[in-house]
Regions:
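Active-site and NAD+-binding cores of ADP-ribose-processing enzymes
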Residues: 1-206
Length: 206
């Protein structure tokens, strides 16, 4: 997935935060700013290098604030662009690139949906999101054909994540977060990254 680099070592006029330097300007890279770092915190939604990961939400709507009352299971779902693309069919689809602030993720097994009970359990245990190795979305037709030829398509639910990763090395994680303020747009954001404002674009303090 495309992610924006955020670590910049050395003394900068923007000041230091946690041993890393952050610019006060979002003109070049918003993930370098102090505002972003305050909002992002110790989020675990990062790439293999530990940098903030851009993930995607597929929809046919124009969303400025996510609304939990409009979800089937109470969670907001994100993944790779290929995964998000598979969640929406037909014309007018919109793939929204975002960053997620989730520092306490519950690792769960993908059984092809029915996340409502798992979301409630994760919330009850104090988690702020769920991460899972996606077994059903974002796989190419070539991978599906290979799995079918190997007789594995009917065995996906029974596989452990380790077994699935071995069978499908290109598989990627997906994420579910519970609160609108955990989501900020990766494009068109004014740079405030206000943790109290659910608007994903402007995030202006009120």
């Amino acid at each position: 997935l495309p992610a924006r680099g955020w670590v910049e070592r050395g003394q900068k006029s923007g000041g230091m935060f946690g041993g890393l330097a952050f610019s006060r300007s979002a003109s070049n890279d918003p993930t370098l700013t102090e505002n972003f770092r305050r909002w992002f915190g110790d989020s675990k939604v990062v790439d293999s290098a530990g940098k903030p990961l851009v993930v995607y939400h597929g929809t046919k709507s124009v969303i400025t604030e996510f609304d939990g009352s409009k979800t089937a299971d109470g969670g907001f779902h994100f993944g790779t662009s290929a995964q998000a693309n598979m969640r929406v069919s037909g014309e007018g689809k919109n793939l929204m690139p975002v960053y997620l602030s989730a520092s306490s993720l519950q690792r769960s097994k993908d059984l092809g949906g029915n996340w409502k009970a798992k979301i409630k359990a994760a919330q009850a245990s104090g988690k702020d999101g769920i991460v899972y190795l996606n077994r059903y979305e974002g796989l190419s037709s070539e991978v599906i054909s290979r799995l079918s030829g190997e007789g594995l398509l009917d065995k996906l639910d029974r596989m452990s994540d380790t077994e699935f990763r071995r069978a499908v090395p290109e598989a990627e994680d997906s994420y579910i977060v519970f609160h609108p303020t955990q989501i900020k747009s990766a494009i068109g954001n004014n740079g405030n990254f206000d943790p109290a404002n659910p608007d994903i674009r402007f995030s202006r303090r009120k």
